[in-house]
């Protein structure tokens, strides 16, 4: 009796099985992939190097004790940008959304004062002080500053975030294959108009809730937007 020639068939079976697991990706395969990836990061994490031209400005306890509670007024943030610009920063990137007017701006403080005669002089005096948001906008206009906005799954009535740079597409349209959102929490218009870059802060967690990847591009109403990382580069 002639034996079946398994030698040429086994590689094909292995190929079909591997392809099927990759396409279907059962839960156990996904979990295994995540564990292997995480173990790689623990065994050999990327070493810090002073040669990497990126610095993180961390708001720590010492900073809070010196300057005050967070969030800081926008006039203080303007001083931070100006100082970083003096130190030669190629770009200043904010991983936060300046979506609301500064609550410590003179005009905001003016609204908090009681409307009584004894406070009228203080109310008039606050009108003479420059607005914090305007000071910040003027400062970022003279530096390469990138701000962030947040994509949301809920449609909003406000204008879409500004796109600061165009995109060149080659071949099929990329938009259908990118993460899609219905709305966005954007930066104040007077600040957004002055910054050099504007990118999305969104990241998508894996099924286990861990963030391992950040999309470089995403869409809002079929328009392509860069992530904060892509815009900074």
Give the predicted meaning of each segment.
Residues 2-233:
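Non-transmembrane functional regions of envelope-associated proteins
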């Amino acid at each position: 009796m002639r034996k079946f020639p398994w030698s040429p068939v086994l590689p094909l079976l292995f190929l079909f099985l591997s392809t099927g697991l990759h396409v279907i990706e059962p839960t156990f395969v996904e979990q295994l992939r995540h564990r292997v990836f995480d173990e790689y990061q623990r065994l050999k994490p990327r070493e810090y190097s002073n040669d990497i031209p990126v610095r993180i400005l961390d708001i720590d306890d010492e900073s809070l004790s010196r300057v005050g509670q967070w969030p800081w007024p926008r006039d203080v943030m303007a001083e931070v940008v100006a100082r970083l610009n003096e130190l030669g920063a190629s770009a200043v990137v904010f991983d936060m959304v300046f979506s609301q007017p500064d609550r410590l701006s003179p005009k905001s403080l003016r609204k908090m004062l009681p409307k009584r005669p004894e406070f009228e002089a203080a109310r008039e005096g606050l009108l003479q002080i420059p607005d914090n948001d305007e000071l910040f906008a003027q400062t970022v206009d003279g530096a390469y500053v990138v701000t962030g906005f947040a994509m949301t799954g809920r449609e909003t009535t406000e204008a879409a975030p500004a796109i600061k740079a165009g995109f060149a597409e080659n071949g099929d349209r990329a938009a259908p294959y990118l993460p899609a959102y219905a709305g966005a929490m954007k930066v104040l218009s007077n600040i957004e108009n002055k910054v050099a870059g504007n990118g999305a802060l969104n990241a998508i967690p894996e099924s286990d809730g861990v963030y391992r990847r950040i999309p470089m591009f995403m869409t809002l109403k079929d328009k392509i937007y860069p992530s904060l990382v892509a815009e900074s580069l």
